[in-house]
């Protein structure tokens, strides 16, 4: 669960 750009990651 982490905020990853351009898509969220686990």
Curated annotation (Swiss-Prot):
Broad class of the protein's primary localization: secreted
Residue numbers carrying Valine amide: 10
GO biological process, one term: neuropeptide signaling pathway
Cellular compartments annotated: Secreted
Gene Ontology CC annotations of this record: extracellular region
Superkingdom as given in the UniProt entry: Eukaryota
Keyword presence, tRNA processing: no
Sorted UniProt keywords: Amidation, Neuropeptide, Secreted
Family note: Belongs to the periviscerokinin family.
Task performed by this protein: Mediates visceral muscle contractile activity (myotropic activity).
Descriptive protein name: Periviscerokinin-3
């Amino acid at each position: 669960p982490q905020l990853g750009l351009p898509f969220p990651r686990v």
